[in-house]
Amino acid sequence: MPSSITSKLDKFRCMKRSISEINLDPLQRGGILTPEARAALVEWGDGYSVCDFCEGMLDRVRNPPVEEFVHEILPRFLDVDDVRITHGAREGMYAAMHSLCDAGDYIVADGNAHYTTVLAAERAGLEISYVENSGEPEYTINPEGYREAIRDAADQGYRVSMAVLTYPDGNYGNLVDARRVAEICHEEGVPLLLNGAYSIGRMPVSARELDADIVVGSGHKSMASSGPIGVLGAKQEYADIIFRRSKSKKNKEVELLGCTVRGAGLLTMMASFPHVLERVGRWQEEVDKARWFSSELEELGIEQQGEKPHNHDLMFFKSERLYEISKSARKGRYFLYHELKDRGICGIKPGLTRQFKLSTYLIPREDLERVVSAFHEIIEMGSRVEAE
């Protein structure tokens, strides 16, 4: 290898991560590893380590007990007929769309859908009709909008072969009435896919109770797993199609390209699962804590957007006050990031002051009190500087 390249490689040998005491990042709160998962990460970190006793199908490996986890534990946890491990929620969505829809079909999705819903549909050759949100400040989705969107597309001669609901959405943390959406979709003859990337592993989600036909979840977002990893569950009538086997490679499932996560991601998910199951049972505590935190910030003039009272730990805030302070602050629009970092707080993206999102998930009340105090100090400091 040329010396011009090898001379640059030392930086890759021992990479470190800088993180503050309190991390508010919604992407990361639900994916923080348990001590058991960190131990599994070391034990099973080698590539293909899970395949010591594999007979050709990842989900049928018995040592470690992958088969039991995938075919017994996860279906009971999600309350769904059949489950597989994927590389993430997006891969699960694509597998479902590609197998259940035909190129040129339409899907109906909520207007708050994650960008990966759009990309999965595009990759599968599908068009999208949106159920628009209500706009500022709540950005809610009306379940009846699904009926309108399905019928509008059908009236134009298009086949609607799937509906997608983001539960909750990744911007505002809104939880739509999923059971009502499912009821409407089924009345119109359309299966519903529930994107639970921010719910499965944080809060109770029963596919059967919600009557969702397909559910996808994210291990690295919400199941205390190292990424990338996700789960894909389906009712039997759809599972038979999504998880169909190859005609030529009889023990390989086509949509999953045979085997998916073959090492650390899967074993960290399994090692964390007892903790994940326990924390799901304490979900109401997390909701109460999020509502308290929102009310405290609103007293400082930082306004929570989305549903109120809020029903999820992910929240979106707007603050004209912080934005005005940023105009004269020495570090400009990056001032909030640095002020919080100086106080041991991270997770709000650098450069954001006027609007930002955060999560209170699994953060102790006393740490959230520190965050509230930090915002109070920052606003007071900015006001004094402006007065001078």
UniProtKB/Swiss-Prot annotation:
InterPro entries named in the record: Orn_Lys_Arg_decarboxylase-I, PyrdxlP-dep_Trfase, PyrdxlP-dep_Trfase_major, PyrdxlP-dep_Trfase_small, Sep_Cys-tRNA_synth_arc, SepSecS/SepCysS
Position of the signal peptide: none
Keyword Transferase tagged: yes
EC number: 2.5.1.73
Catalytic activity: O-phospho-L-seryl-tRNA(Cys) + hydrogen sulfide + H(+) = L-cysteinyl-tRNA(Cys) + phosphate
UniProt xrefs under Pfam families: SepSecS
Cofactor requirements of the protein: pyridoxal 5'-phosphate
SUPFAM superfamilies, per database record: PLP-dependent transferases (SSF53383)
Major enzyme class: transferase
Keywords: Protein biosynthesis, Pyridoxal phosphate, Transferase
Sites bearing N6-(pyridoxal phosphate)lysine, chain numbering: 221
Residues noted as binding pyridoxal 5'-phosphate in the record, renumbered to the chain: 89-90, 195, 218-220
Domain of life from the UniProt record: Archaea
Family label: Belongs to the SepCysS family.
Function (record text): Converts O-phospho-L-seryl-tRNA(Cys) (Sep-tRNA(Cys)) to L-cysteinyl-tRNA(Cys) (Cys-tRNA(Cys)).
Subunit organization: Homodimer. Interacts with SepRS.
The protein's name: O-phospho-L-seryl-tRNA:Cys-tRNA synthase
